[in-house]
């Protein structure tokens, strides 16, 4: 389903194998990640399904600045007046979302993991080659609640995938948005289950594995940047990711 309910008051919009989330809070609707350009229409559908209107969207947080997570930031700024929040180390990347380092060349992965090709094609069809960045952002530097963001999500820096990657936690609701720090579908290998993203899309795989310690233990619904939600103890998902290693 392109749009589905993943937790009470939370809808996931999925296009090109990438997830964007719409979260109902007491302070308005919060968007977590801006996906690809195709997500714009799907997020609008999710807002309507929550019985809300575009004017009710009052916040946008980005787990990181890669092109497949900032796909509609420019449109959200223009049409909704939203300025996205992102870790300060990834702020330049939001403005230039294709200009990032990765540990291994992607062409090698396409040959070695042919099952990932349909995912890559789906990303292109969802607008992966036509993402417009945004230079005006709001930033945070460390861990802690974002008081000016609806729902006051707790930012959890999880560097490795990018220098400024961060997860977001809503502890009172048991929701953990992990972006690409912890996924259940690796878009470069097509492998499923809790894991970190392959070296084709990750700057520092060792650091990415190490930073999983920042994710709080306990029961939660883990909402990743790629793949299906995962429910259970966060430490079990982290252990599974470490066992899986990095493709």
Each predicted region: which residue ranges?
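Conserved beta-strand hairpin/beta-sheet module of binuclear metal-dependent hydrolase folds
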Residues: 1-50, 54, 168-184
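Divalent metal-coordination and catalytic microenvironments
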Residues: 9, 23, 33, 43, ...
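Short alpha-helical
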Residues: 18, 38, 68, 92, ...
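Metallo-beta-lactamase
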Residues: 37-38, 128-132, 136, 145-147, ...
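Active-site HxH/HxHxD metal-binding segment of metal-dependent hydrolases
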Residues: 48-138, 145, 240
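Short glycine/proline- and charge-enriched loop/turn segments
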Residues: 101-105, 189-199, 241-244
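Binuclear metal-ion centers of metallo-dependent hydrolases, dominated by the metallo-beta-lactamase
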Residues: 229-247
């Amino acid at each position: 389903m392109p749009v589905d309910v993943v937790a009470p008051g939370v809808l996931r919009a999925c296009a090109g194998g990438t997830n964007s989330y719409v979260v109902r809070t007491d302070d308005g609707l919060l968007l977590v990640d801006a996906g690809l350009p195709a997500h714009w229409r799907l997020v609008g559908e999710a807002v309507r399904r929550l019985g809300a209107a575009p004017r009710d969207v009052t916040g946008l947080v980005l787990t990181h600045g890669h092109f497949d997570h900032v796909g509609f930031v420019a449109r959200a700024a223009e049409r909704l007046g939203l300025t996205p929040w992102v870790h300060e180390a990834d702020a330049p990347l939001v403005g230039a979302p294709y200009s990032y380092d990765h540990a291994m060349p992607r062409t090698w992965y396409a040959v070695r993991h042919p099952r990932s090709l349909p995912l890559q094609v789906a990303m292109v069809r969802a607008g992966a080659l036509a993402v417009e960045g945004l230079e005006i952002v709001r930033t945070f530097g460390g861990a802690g609640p974002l008081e000016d963001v609806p729902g006051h999500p707790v930012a959890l820096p999880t560097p490795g995938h990018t220098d400024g990657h961060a997860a977001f936690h809503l502890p009172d609701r048991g929701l953990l948005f992990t972006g690409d720090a912890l996924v259940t579908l690796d878009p470069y290998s097509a492998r499923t289950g809790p894991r970190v993203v392959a070296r084709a899309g990750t700057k520092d795989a060792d650091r990415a594995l190490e930073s999983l310690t920042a994710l709080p233990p306990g029961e939660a619904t883990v909402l990743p940047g790629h793949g299906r939600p995962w429910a259970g103890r966060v430490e079990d998902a982290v252990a599974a990711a470490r066992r899986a290693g990095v493709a």
